[in-house]
């Protein structure tokens, strides 16, 4: 049986408290979408960044709702504010950082959902992102290839 349709209201969805002031609200989980996609909204204070990494099995998209994000996709660096969209295809190293002077809100989508399953698992455990639970990310096809490039 395929996925059932549903509506997720703004104040709904399980929250992963990743670090003080940083959270991810899971808006569409893999099991709800027949594993076709996973979507979450991240609140990222200024200075929040990711390691340079890539996904083996999922493409990643980002849509900046507020604040400013600097993306590095492959060798290209782009700074964008609200309305900026980014596509990070599987196999291409990428990273991002909250820049500018305010906390950012960013909507992220993985398709298919495999890479997002790591976030679902970490939300259940309420594991702080600083512990860098690499084995969870690796299990779901995400591989770090370097430190934050910013």
Protein language model regions, located:
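Ligand-binding loop in jelly-roll beta-barrel domains
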Residues: 70, 81, 90-116
